[in-house]
């Protein structure tokens, strides 16, 4: 069972790595093509206006591809965060244990202070009762 879990984690991490490389490569390739098209030094059989329109359309398509790759990268980051939040039980357990230990120590501290106040009040009340019952003005 543990081995299958480890293999699935490795496969998931490999797929994340593959997606990352593909998206970055797509962004880089499309950007390079946009820069190449912006130079406008292509000698073709088409008229200058036709070539300009074709280059403009290709730049728009490549810019859309860059945006798509960027959105894919943002989705990848979201998936990685979700994976870490849902599958990182060790650190979650550590956080829960440390916070519960902090709350227990705070509770014990408060309980000790309350017991000290109770003892002081009981001693003061005893002194007041003794003074009252021994007083000649009662």
UniProtKB/Swiss-Prot annotation:
Protein family: Belongs to the Mediator complex subunit 22 family.
Signal peptide: none
Subunit text: Component of the Mediator complex.
Primary localization class, coarse: nucleus
GO biological process: regulation of transcription by RNA polymerase II
Subcellular locations according to the entry: Nucleus
Protein name, entry field: Mediator of RNA polymerase II transcription subunit 22
Superkingdom of source: Eukaryota
Keyword Nucleus recorded: yes
Protein role: Component of the Mediator complex, a coactivator involved in the regulated transcription of nearly all RNA polymerase II-dependent genes. Mediator functions as a bridge to convey information from gene-specific regulatory proteins to the basal RNA polymerase II transcription machinery. Mediator is recruited to promoters by direct interactions with regulatory proteins and serves as a scaffold for the assembly of a functional preinitiation complex with RNA polymerase II and the general transcription factors.
GO molecular function list: transcription coregulator activity
GO CC annotation, single: mediator complex
Coiled coil: none
Keywords for the protein's UniProt record, in alphabetical order: Activator, Nucleus, Transcription, Transcription regulation
InterPro entries found in the cross-reference section: Med22
